[in-house]
C-alpha cells in the first residue's frame, strides 16, 4: 500500500510540475496559428486589391496576332455584342454567333462602319435546339480560320425567380442545353486548332450563381456551377498547350437577361464590364481561391472575395439570404404581371 501511495504522490507531482509547461506550449501554438490566420487573410486581401486595381492582365496579342479571329457566342445583345465590338477594335476579325439573324446583320454593319479593316462572319443558330447541322455549319465556317479567341457568352436564365418544382419543363431544358451543351460543343470545335497552334484564349461567362447556391434560380445556378467546374478542369488540361482558359465570375450587369437598366457601383453596364474583363485576363481579381477563374470588375471582385474568402459560399445562411432576395423579386414580378394583365383586360 505504501508503494502505491508513493506512485500516486509521484504522479501528482508530475501533473503539478508539467501542467504549466503544457499550458504555455498550447498558448504558443494558438498564438502562432492565430497570427498565421490573420496574416494569411491580410495577404489574400492585399492580393485581391493588387489584382483588381494595380496589375494588368495578359495582352490579347499573346493569344494571336492582329488579323486572327475571335468567336463570340450570344453576340447580338448585351455582353456578347460588347465583347464583339471591343475585340474588333483591338484588330481581330470576328465570327458572330447568335439566334437572331437581323441583329447579327446590324452588328456586322456596325463593326464594318467603325472598323473597316476588320472582317466579320456570322451564323444564326438557336442553341436551344442543339441541332447537329448547326454545329456542322459552324465547323465549316471556322475550319480554315486562325481562331485565337473564343468568348462563350451564350446563356439563358429563368424569366423570373421560380421554385424548382414550378419551373416549366421547356425552361429547364433550354437553360441546360444553352448554358452547358452549347458552351461545350462550341469549345470542342475550337480546341483542336488552338492546341495545334499552341496558343489561344477560351473565356466563358460564369455567374455568382455558380459560386453561391441560388434558391428559386436552382437550374440556372446549377448550370453555372457546372461551367465553373468544367472550365477549371479544362484549364488544367489545356495549360500545357499554351491555351488560357478562364471563367469570368460576374454579378449583376445591366442587360436583357438581368432586366436591370440602371447602373450603380455594383451593377455596371456591358461596356464597363467587358473593358475590365479584357484588361484583366489571367488575373484572379476577387477570386484568389479559384484556379482558371476571375472576378475582374472591381466591385464584383470585392463581393466575390467576401462571399468566398470571408463567408462560406456554401453555407445555409448565405443560401437563405439568396432565397429571401429571390422570393422578394418573384413577388414584385408577379404583382407587376398582374397589373399589366389588368390593364390589358380593362
Curated annotation (Swiss-Prot):
Pfam family, one: adh_short
Active site: 220 (proton donor), 224 (lowers pka of active site tyr)
Bilayer topology term: Single-pass membrane protein
Sites where the protein binds NADP(+): 71, 126, 134, 153, 220, 224, 253, 255
InterPro entries attached to this UniProt entry: 3_ketoreductase_fungal (IPR027533), NAD(P)-bd_dom_sf (IPR036291), Sc_DH/Rdtase_CS (IPR020904), SDR_fam (IPR002347)
Transmembrane segments: 26-46
Cellular component GO terms, alphabetical: endoplasmic reticulum; endoplasmic reticulum membrane
Subcellular location, record wording: Endoplasmic reticulum membrane
Biological pathway: Lipid metabolism; fatty acid biosynthesis
GO molecular function, one term: very-long-chain 3-oxoacyl-CoA reductase activity
Family annotation (Gene3D superfamilies): NAD(P)-binding Rossmann-like Domain
One GO term of the biological process aspect: very long-chain fatty acid biosynthetic process
Principal location class: endoplasmic reticulum
Keyword Manganese among record annotations: no
Keyword Oxidoreductase: yes
Enzyme class label: oxidoreductase
Entry-linked CDD domains: 17beta-HSD1_like_SDR_c
Record-stated family: Belongs to the short-chain dehydrogenases/reductases (SDR) family.
Name the UniProt record assigns to this protein: Very-long-chain 3-oxoacyl-CoA reductase
Amino acid at each position: 500500500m505504501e508503494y502505491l501511495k508513493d506512485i500516486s504522490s509521484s504522479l501528482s507531482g508530475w501533473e503539478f510540475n508539467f501542467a504549466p509547461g503544457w499550458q504555455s506550449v498550447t498558448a504558443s501554438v494558438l498564438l502562432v496559428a492565430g497570427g498565421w490566420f490573420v496574416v494569411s487573410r491580410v495577404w489574400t486581401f492585399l492580393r485581391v486589391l493588387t489584382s483588381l486595381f494595380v496589375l494588368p492582365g495578359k495582352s490579347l496579342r499573346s493569344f494571336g496576332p492582329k488579323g486572327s479571329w475571335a468567336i463570340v457566342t450570344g453576340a447580338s445583345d448585351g455582353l456578347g455584342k460588347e465583347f464583339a465590338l471591343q475585340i474588333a477594335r483591338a484588330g481581330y476579325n470576328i465570327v458572330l454567333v447568335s439566334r437572331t439573324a437581323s441583329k447579327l446583320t446590324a452588328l456586322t454593319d456596325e463593326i464594318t462602319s467603325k472598323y473597316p479593316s476588320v472582317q466579320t462572319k456570322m451564323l444564326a443558330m438557336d442553341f436551344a435546339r442543339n441541332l447537329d447541322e448547326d454545329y456542322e455549319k459552324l465547323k465549316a465556317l471556322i475550319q480554315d480560320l486562325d481562331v485565337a479567341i473564343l468568348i462563350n457568352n451564350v446563356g439563358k436564365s429563368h424569366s423570373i425567380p421560380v421554385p424548382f418544382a414550378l419551373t416549366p419543363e421547356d425552361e429547364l431544358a433550354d437553360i441546360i442545353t444553352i448554358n452547358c451543351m452549347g458552351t461545350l460543343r462550341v469549345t470542342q470545335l475550337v480546341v483542336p486548332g488552338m492546341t495545334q497552334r499552341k496558343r489561344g484564349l477560351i473565356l466563358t461567362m460564369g455567374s455568382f450563381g455558380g459560386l453561391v447556391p441560388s434558391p428559386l434560380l436552382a437550374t440556372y445556378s446549377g448550370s453555372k456551377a457546372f461551367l465553373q467546374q468544367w472550365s477549371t478542369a479544362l484549364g488544367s488540361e489545356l495549360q500545357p498547350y499554351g491555351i488560357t482558359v478562364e471563367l469570368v465570375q460576374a454579378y449583376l450587369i445591366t442587360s436583357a437577361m438581368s432586366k436591370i437598366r440602371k447602373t450603380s457601383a455594383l451593377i455596371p453596364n456591358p461596356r464597363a464590364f467587358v473593358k475590365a474583363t479584357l484588361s484583366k485576363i489571367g488575373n484572379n481579381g476577387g477570386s484568389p481561391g479559384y484556379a482558371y477563374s476571375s472576378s475582374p470588375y472591381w466591385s464584383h471582385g470585392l463581393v466575390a472575395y467576401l462571399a468566398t474568402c470571408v463567408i462560406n459560399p456554401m453555407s445555409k445562411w448565405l443560401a437563405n439570404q439568396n432565397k429571401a432576395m429571390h422570393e422578394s423579386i418573384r413577388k414584385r414580378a408577379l404583382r407587376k404581371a398582374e397589373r399589366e394583365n389588368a390593364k390589358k383586360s380593362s
